[in-house]
Amino acid sequence: YYAQHDMKSSNNTFNFYDFVISFPVYKSLAMYAGVTPYSDVGYEMTSKITDPAIISSTGVITNTVQGYGGMTNIFLGAGYEVIKGLSVGVEGQYYFGNLHKTNDFVMTNSTYRSISSGFNMNLDAVTARFGVQYETRLTQGLSAVIGATYRLGTSLKGKVERYEIQSISSINDSTPSPRNYTDTLGRGQVKLASELGVGIALKGGGKWTAEINYIRSDWSSSGMNKIPGFASVGNAVFSASTAQSVRAGFSIVPNRNDIRYYSK
């Protein structure tokens, strides 16, 4: 809530980043479901054109480029222990979300048209992930876990709306009507890349765990560098390529039977 003199404003918002629930189905079978962010877009850049040769007639030109939105992943999966220590799993995934990109040119001279253009994208996709995991005891109280996952590449579907609005303050009757068109993404035009992940963990009984994971996705054939709304505009150069990440982590629970552990 914000208030200053006779101005008042209030805003309520709610958001969450990760939510997962798991439950046993049978002695060797368990299921889980959850929701997590997949991608986020959030940027805003402003520049001014001050070249005297240009602004002598147009006035200072302000260019603002902005992008916002994101995609969310809803998933449902199951894991099954085939034999002692060896487990396999499968996960269904649904991606959905909206992305918005705007490009505004504002003229200070009211006899020139200001232009606002951009893209509104409503996107979704369905895919699946498969995994395998093996756990073996190394010594008394120490075990190792090795695992791998693979997510299938899939076509990104939805609609991409391109719009352009021109405005002028001094000659209202000469302002062109807003222009826009909507393109339905055909199958295979844009793809979400497949993903390969491998990892290894060491577990010290029920007290501590240390792990390292490697994930690789090849986006070079995703088509995003060719389709309007995804591809770069103007002289900027964009080319989708391979994304790789290495992640490591460590956790410790000194006393798993402590009542404070169950109250977390």
Where are these predicted regions, by residue range?
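Outer-membrane beta-barrel porins/channels
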Residues: 16, 24-264
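Surface-exposed strand-loop-strand hairpins of Gram-negative outer-membrane beta-barrel proteins
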Residues: 1-13
